[in-house]
Swiss-Prot record:
GO molecular function, one term: rRNA binding
Function recorded in the entry: Located at the top of the head of the 30S subunit, it contacts several helices of the 16S rRNA. In the 70S ribosome it contacts the 23S rRNA (bridge B1a) and protein L5 of the 50S subunit (bridge B1b), connecting the 2 subunits; these bridges are implicated in subunit movement. Contacts the tRNAs in the A and P-sites.
Species annotation: Sorangium cellulosum (strain So ce56) (Polyangium cellulosum (strain So ce56))
Protein name: Small ribosomal subunit protein uS13
SUPFAM superfamilies: S13-like H2TH domain (SSF46946)
Segments passing through the bilayer: none
The keyword Ribosomal protein appears for this protein: yes
């Protein structure tokens, strides 16, 4: 099993479909990596030689940020926005959408489950 950037790639998949299992690599970038390392896209991960795995690993280390480094950079960017106190930072701090989406009826993913209305108790009768 090929282990790249701390992630085990699925053995039975083609290289072009296995590389997107790494955070920060999508389908297009996976195809570019295959092209740069001269590895056929339809070759399966289990068929890769140690030299080919090393070539992919070296290319990722040299040219791209993936996994932990990329996650850290994204978190630092969000933290910087919050420290600046700009509008986007405030939206992140409040857990609301930051890119202008409506929140009156939607944005349930960011806002969490509905709070529900409080039920009034009927007045006591004498």
């Amino acid at each position: 099993m090929a282990r790249i950037a701390g992630v085990d790639l699925p053995r039975r998949k083609h290289v072009a479909y296995a590389l997107p299992y790494l955070f920060g690599i999508g389908r297009t970038l996976a195809l570019q990596i295959c092209e740069k390392t001269n590895i056929p896209q339809n070759k399966r991960v289990e068929e890769l030689s140690d030299a080919e795995v090393k070539a992919i690993r070296d290319l990722l280390d040299a040219e791209y940020k993936v996994e932990g480094d990329l996650r850290r950079e994204v978190q630092l960017n969000i933290k910087r926005l919050m420290d600046l106190g700009c509008y986007r930072g405030l939206r992140h701090r409040r857990g609301l959408p930051a890119n202008g989406q409506r929140t009156h009826t939607n944005a349930r993913t960011r806002k969490g489950p509905r709070k529900g209305m409080l039920q009034r108790r009927p007045a006591a009768t004498k």
